[in-house]
């Protein structure tokens, strides 16, 4: 009996062990299945190859003085290109990896390319990257929202609320292909549409030169350009005035307000630089028409995306019709990229936001240049006051996008020529409707551009000698400072 009982107990024990073993195996198998399913769902398929290509190109070394892009290549002749992306060097650098500085190269202080923000986006490479499928939004329109992304509109309203630079609640938002298209759409919407009494487009001197160039280029019988708003301040006979107010102003960074106060006068506010990295945000702007662009906001000039905030429904409708007939909406890829970048900024780390990075960079550049010019008796810069900023909750130092430099000597009436003799290429004052004793110098370029500018200005001021150099007119390329 004892042996039978022992055998029975062993059998039961064996069954228990087998049962436990089977359960363990079953659990392990289930876990493995879930892991396999998870890894399978995370595994890249069609996006794997373009992702690898993007990583490979981004890793190309350009000695810190240039960038390689997927679509960059060295053209050997019209029908043949060298294989693979190559480095595109910053101004005054050359070589296969941009390793050679060209000391005699003129400083590029003309361009308004906002490349000062490039380091921020490189630091946020993962969160700002995006992959676009070959079949992404092939239609002309978004479902139920026409030519404009509803999600992007919502993000723009959210961004303005965070920064506190514009009232958007109860306002219409319309997209355009950069700032240039929006300016003309707004002028068209506000014009009298009367060939016998055309509207006059008037900015305040110094003004952003694109206003004049574009208005004259697209000039219709319904409107024409006039140089100075101050000439029309006391004119009550003219009822069709459209004042373009740039605030902060390009080129001098001043916070302008409309001068024309007649009931029939209209104003378009260029708010492209009304962001906390360029100026103090004192209150939300609440103008009838306010224009903004992605290039001035986050640096992506090549995306060609801008937007207008409009109060009046009739004006909004006329602008919308103009933009629809002009380009049938804005590129869906541009809207997608704008949306992606907007999310990065909204969800940004508090310790290093784009606004912090941008403000520190521009403030430091202005301080360095101003410190050098302030000791000169030959040159001066515009005066910009310290102001309280509601976004940063503190009094902030100036950080303008451009330096508006003036030659102080009576005999030096062509300041552009004076700087050109010192290998510094800026934009003439007359380009902005002002005297040629002024020159606009861009501060928004690469760090290489700014360092080179600072070096040449130091040399020029250290000499402080009369200079009667007279150079040929060097035009400021329109597309270099949009």
Q: Which ranges hold each PLM region?
A:
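PLP-dependent class I/II
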Residues: 2-32, 86-88, 97, 101-482
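Ser/Thr/Pro/Gly-rich low-complexity linker/stalk segments immediately outside membranes or between
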Residues: 28-57
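Short, 15-30-residue, compositionally biased linear elements
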Residues: 51-52, 82, 415-417
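Disulfide-braced loops of extracellular cysteine-rich modules
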Residues: 55-65
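Short helix-capping and inter-helix turn/linker motifs at the boundaries of alpha-helical repeat units
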Residues: 57, 75-79, 394
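Onset and early core of a folded interaction/catalytic domain in large eukaryotic regulators
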Residues: 58-59, 73, 95
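Immunoglobulin-superfamily Ig-like beta-sandwich domains in protein ectodomains
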Residues: 65-67, 72-73, 230-236
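Extracellular cysteine-rich, disulfide-stabilized repeat modules
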Residues: 68-70, 75-92
């Amino acid at each position: 009996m004892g042996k039978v009982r022992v055998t029975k107990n062993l059998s039961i024990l064996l069954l228990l062990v087998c049962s436990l073993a089977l359960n363990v195996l079953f659990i392990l198998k289930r876990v493995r299945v879930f892991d396999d399913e998870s890894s399978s769902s995370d595994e890249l398929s069609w996006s794997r190859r373009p992702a690898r290509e993007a990583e490979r190109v981004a890793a190309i070394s350009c000695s810190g003085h240039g960038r390689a892009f997927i679509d960059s290549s060295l053209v050997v002749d019209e029908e043949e290109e060298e294989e693979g992306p190559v480095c595109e060097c910053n101004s005054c650098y050359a070589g296969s990896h941009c390793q050679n500085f060209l000391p005699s190269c003129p400083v590029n202080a003309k361009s308004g390319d906002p490349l000062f923000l490039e380091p921020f986006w490189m630091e946020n490479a993962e969160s700002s990257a995006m992959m676009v499928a070959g079949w992404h939004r092939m239609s002309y329109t978004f479902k139920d929202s026409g030519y404009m992304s509803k999600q992007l509109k919502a993000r723009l309203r959210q961004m303005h609320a965070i920064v506190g630079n514009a009232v958007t609640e109860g306002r219409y938002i319309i997209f355009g292909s950069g700032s240039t298209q929006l300016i003309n759409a707004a002028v068209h919407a506000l014009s009298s549409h009367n060939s016998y009494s055309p509207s006059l487009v008037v900015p305040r001197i110094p003004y952003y030169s694109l206003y004049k160039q574009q208005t004259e280029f697209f000039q219709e019988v319904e409107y024409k350009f006039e140089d100075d708003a101050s000439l029309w301040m006391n004119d009550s006979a003219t009822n069709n005035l459209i004042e373009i107010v740039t605030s902060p102003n390009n080129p001098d960074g001043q916070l302008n307000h409309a001068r024309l106060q007649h009931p029939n006068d209209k104003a378009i506010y260029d708010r492209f630089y009304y962001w906390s990295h360029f100026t103090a945000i004192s209150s939300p702007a609440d103008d009838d028409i306010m224009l903004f662009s992605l290039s001035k906001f986050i640096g992506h000039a090549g995306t060609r995306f801008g937007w207008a905030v409009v109060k009046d429904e009739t004006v909004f409708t006329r602008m919308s019709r103009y933009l629809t007939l002009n380009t049938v909406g804005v590129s869906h890829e541009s809207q997608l990229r704008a949306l992606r970048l907007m999310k990065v900024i909204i969800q940004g780390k508090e310790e290093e936001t784009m606004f912090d990075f941008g403000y520190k960079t521009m403030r430091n550049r202005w301080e360095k240049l101003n410190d050098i010019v302030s000791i000169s008796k030959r040159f001066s810069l515009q005066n910009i006051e310290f102001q309280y900023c509601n976004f940063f909750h503190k009094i902030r130092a100036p950080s303008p996008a451009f330096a508006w430099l003036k030659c102080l000597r009576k005999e030096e009436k062509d300041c552009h020529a004076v700087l050109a003799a010192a290998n510094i290429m800026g934009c003439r004052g007359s380009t902005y409707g002002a005297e040629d004793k002024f020159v606009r110098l861009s501060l928004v370029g690469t760090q290489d551009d700014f360092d080179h500018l600072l070096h040449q200005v130091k040399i020029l001021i250290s000499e402080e000698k009369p200079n009667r150099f007279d150079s040929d007119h060097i035009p400021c390329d329109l597309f270099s400072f949009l």
